[in-house]
Amino acid sequence: MFFIKKHHLINFLILSFATPLIFATEIYRSEDDQGRVTYSDTASAESRQVKIISRSYRHLHHVSRIYDGDTVILEDGKHVRLLGINTPEIKNHQREDEPGGVAAKKWLQAQLQDNKVYLEHDQVKQDKYKRLLAHLYLPDGKHLNLALLENGLATVSIIPPNLRHAEELIHAQQQAEKLKLGIWSMPDYQPQPLSQISNHDKGWQRFTGTPVSIKKNRKYTRLIFNDKVDIRIANINLDLFPALTTYLGKPLEIRGWVSRSKDHYSILIYHPSALILQ
């Protein structure tokens, strides 16, 4: 057991954010009859738990360029992909602008005019494209990933095991959607029936449909909508979802990217935030 006096609490909390904790992260506050406050790692009948966010690291970097609404390039040339979100693509030699892509990029450029940003990583720090994965913060503490969602400039895209801030991100999206901000008011991102899915559907999309059966193999479990359309969930992520039978026979909105194999269409779902019961 350890105790921390009241006047040392601020220093303790600062260290909790800046360095790895080498002791328990459940901290309890208690106060005696004379008003003396102590903090302990052991609960008592009179104590209450103090919420501590452990193992959160933020490192200062300098941005050289904004690639698009969810990717920045640091001074050392490394690309950083913002975690937990997706913004529409911007024009390059392979594709045209997606609606809302330029607006997201311009917004991020305006936020990063002084080029200073703090990076906070999660469980997986780099993707298959060798990009760093991070939550971005301004020096004043503004969470840019979250703010993009709040302004309707991005959509939630949570990929396990990077689940940090998932609840806050989902809530921000729900509020922007409710207010029809940004992309939530754009015709290109309104839900369409899965029965109308085609190879013309590119980028992030919203679909509606009712699953009728479940099929499982070694790697994926699939919710089947008809003989040409399914959504698939990696079996290693199933614990994040309610029992998939919960979805059977119920209208769903599905959010994600369509892949095609011959005349069959499939949408890979990583997190239950992409499946919304209607």
Predicted regions: what they are:
Residues 11-20:
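Bacterial N-terminal signal peptides
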Residues 2, 23-278:
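Small beta-barrel nucleic-acid-binding modules, primarily SNase/OB-fold domains
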Residues 8-9, 32:
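Sequence-pattern detector for short linear motifs
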Residues 1-7:
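Positively charged n-region of N-terminal signal peptides that target proteins for export
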